[in-house]
Amino acid sequence: MEQGLRSDGNNPPSIDKTRVLDVKPLRCLAPVFPSPNGMSSVSTPQPSPFVCVPPTGPFPPGVAPFYPFVAPNDSGRPGESSQQTPSGVPNQGGPFGFAQPISPVPLNSFRTPTTANGNSGRSRRAVDDDDYSNSQDQNDQFASGFSVHVNNVEDSGTGKKRGRPKKPRRAQQAEGLTPVEVDVEPLLTQLLTSFKLVDLDQVKKADGDKELAGRVLLVFDLFRRRMTQIDESRDGPGSGRRPDLKASNMLMTKGVRTNQTKRIGNAPGIEVGDIFFFRMELCLVGLHAPTMAGIDYMSVKLTMDEEPLAVSIVSSGGYDDDGGDGDVLIYTGQGGVQRKDGQVFDQKLERGNLALEKSVHRANEVRVIRGVKDVAYPTGKIYIYDGLYKIQESWAEKNKVGCNVFKYKLLRVPGQPEAFKVWKSIQQWKDGVASRVGVILPDLTSGAESQPVCLVNDVDDEKGPAYFTYIPSLKYSKPFVMPRPSPSCHCVGGCQPGDSNCACIQSNGGFLPYSSLGVLLSYKTLIHECGSACSCPPNCRNRMSQGGPKARLEVFKTKNRGWGLRSWDPIRGGGFICEYAGEVIDAGNYSDDNYIFDATRIYAPLEAERDYNDESRKVPFPLVISAKNGGNISRFMNHSCSPNVYWQLVVRQSNNEATYHIAFFAIRHIPPMQELTFDYGMDKADHRRKKCLCGSLNCRGYFY
């Protein structure tokens, strides 16, 4: 440093090693400026006098110009370039003065030069991540924590910023679209209050149970669906806003989650066979904490030193995993995935891979979540909790591109309910590879529905239910007369979210009630569907309950409750199942309540997110349906005090006539082969009470 300040830098200064220096911290030092003439050099340092120097000089003695205000080459040291000039940015020639100003140089010219091999930093997708797929949009990326990275991601190969592609908003005024602004914060607060999730204590956050985990997942799904409806109304379908990420982020910010404590073994409240449509659902209930990485692990002190042990893995096709026969899984370690720049490398025995290797020797149980493609949404996935496995062995081998990868063979712990095996069996039934055991009729509907409904009994020798006539929809003796003609929509291509010119959307409070996947986005007292006078086609989103069941269903014999109904396909929360078909009868004009649906009974509300400002919130007349002599598959749906299906009142209007229907929707995600049940309601007169055999934790002991 001294040499740089001396005019003669050839002779190094002599150092007096006998002097004792008073060393002080930098923050205690004050700048010392050259003493003016006539003043002692040891006096108290004074502030430097203010000197205004123009960029081009003249400069006071001892002050050198710096780039970009550097003197020209003829300033006294010809042939020497400034050491402060960035490489690749030439000095400006010619006389240096205001008459000839220099060109401005951007600040990014001062960046550190790149290496010859280019930037080898992390690519946009972490190399140790398992593939991450949701049923919305794949543009966002999550780290292994909970921070969302959505914009301005640096591309290491080009140096250009690359992030979520911004989709131009549709010209709302030109297309007749009116954005509906809704504050979601009060909506979330209302949901959390209704489900008693405000200010969860630390004990429940650390260790949950089935009831709490169910409430957390239900609030997440209700809130996510409502935000999907709001986003589509504002930006149109396919806006790619990822309401699942926003909903989960808001919930976790408010501390709404459970099973935060990492553990080996099952997560409390999560049953083997439970399904999830979003990776964030796994995080909220503590089944698998990382939002992208396929391996979750924890540090355990078993000896003098801590060592990592795997607690859960997600196998969803990101690597060359082998699903085996349902009890065996060959899992590929993380890392070594080909990057965007084409580089490939060997996997390393670190982090998750090291934890799996340690678990081989410790023989601890590992939770396994299998991901399968969502047939209804090709870019999405469904995550199945397949229970506990143990790692039997591990080895290294070459993959398809010649790099070393780690392989782990996991065996399922015996004695657990079947989960992934059920999915494989159902696929074999659909493909005709294997036959369904106990089939009495291959299609109970005789072709009346678009999907066949088989009749199955693998319990006893009963050959089927009592005879009835299958009718796919509701029969009215006469429609309900409206006091004034109802408006009909003119959406030739189908009703679209945010279209203020659509009369049916206006009747639903400015929102379409269904998503493009047929999911009910918000629960209302009354849903207005398109009627026969509307111009939209039969496949319009607002005719969801008019097309019959979308899932492959079966009627089966239960062990102690007669015949029941279940699905071969997974059903999303809010997914449409079927309508209650039969004959509309007068209220109170029935003595036998078997195969009766009575809308006048008292039903427990599902949630607090109801539009109580809706003028049509009350049923205009008591709706009672009898399916004893004629009906559809809904007549086989049994009662439960903790149901997984909820009914909604739907009206279809045409001119001055209207018909009311009962449509069933899934309350939460329903895995295949789980019985579909709904609450039959409470009779106001408390008549015809029957013993309940639903077996749920909240069973009342009776039903009507």
Curated annotation (Swiss-Prot):
Ranges of residues in domain Pre-SET: 487-548
Residues given in the record as Zn(2+) 1 binding sites: C489, C491, C495, C502
Composition skew (Basic residues), residue ranges: 159-170
Domain spans labelled YDG: 265-412
Composition-biased stretches (Polar residues): 80-90, 109-121
Catalysed reactions listed for this entry: N(6)-methyl-L-lysyl(27)-[histone H3] + S-adenosyl-L-methionine = N(6),N(6)-dimethyl-L-lysyl(27)-[histone H3] + S-adenosyl-L-homocysteine + H(+); L-lysyl(9)-[histone H3] + 2 S-adenosyl-L-methionine = N(6),N(6)-dimethyl-L-lysyl(9)-[histone H3] + 2 S-adenosyl-L-homocysteine + 2 H(+); L-lysyl(27)-[histone H3] + S-adenosyl-L-methionine = N(6)-methyl-L-lysyl(27)-[histone H3] + S-adenosyl-L-homocysteine + H(+)
Subcellular location: Nucleus; Chromosome
InterPro entries: H3-K9-MeTrfase_plant (IPR025794), H3K9_HMTase_SUVAR3-9 (IPR051357), Post-SET_dom (IPR003616), Pre-SET_dom (IPR007728), PUA-like_sf (IPR015947), SET_dom (IPR001214), SET_dom_sf (IPR046341), SRA-YDG_sf (IPR036987)
Cellular component GO terms held in the UniProt record: chromosome; nucleus
Lineage top rank: taxon: Eukaryota
Region annotated Disordered, chain positions: 1-21, 68-176
Keywords recorded for this protein, A-Z: Chromatin regulator, Chromosome, Metal-binding, Methyltransferase, Nucleus, S-adenosyl-L-methionine, Transferase, Zinc
Molecular function terms from GO: double-stranded DNA binding; histone H3K27 monomethyltransferase activity; histone H3K9 dimethyltransferase activity; histone methyltransferase activity; zinc ion binding
Coarse class of the protein's main subcellular location: nucleus
SMART domains, alphabetized: PreSET, SET, SRA
Binding site for S-adenosyl-L-methionine: R561, G562, W563, D593, Y595, R635, N638, H639
PROSITE patterns in alphabetical order: POST_SET, PRE_SET, SAM_MT43_SUVAR39_2, SET, YDG
EC number: 2.1.1.-, 2.1.1.368, 2.1.1.369
Binding residues annotated for Zn(2+) 4, in chain numbering: C641, C692, C694, C699
Binding site for Zn(2+) 3: C495, C530, C536, C540
GO BP: any one term: methylation
Reported function: Histone methyltransferase. Methylates in vitro both 'Lys-9' and 'Lys-27' of histone H3. Required for in vivo dimethylation of 'Lys-9'. H3 'Lys-9' methylation represents a specific tag for epigenetic control for plant development and transcriptional repression.
Assembly description: Interacts with LHP1.
Family indicated by similarity: Belongs to the class V-like SAM-binding methyltransferase superfamily. Histone-lysine methyltransferase family. Suvar3-9 subfamily.
Protein's UniProt name: Histone-lysine N-methyltransferase, H3 lysine-9 specific SUVH1
Organism listed in the record: Nicotiana tabacum
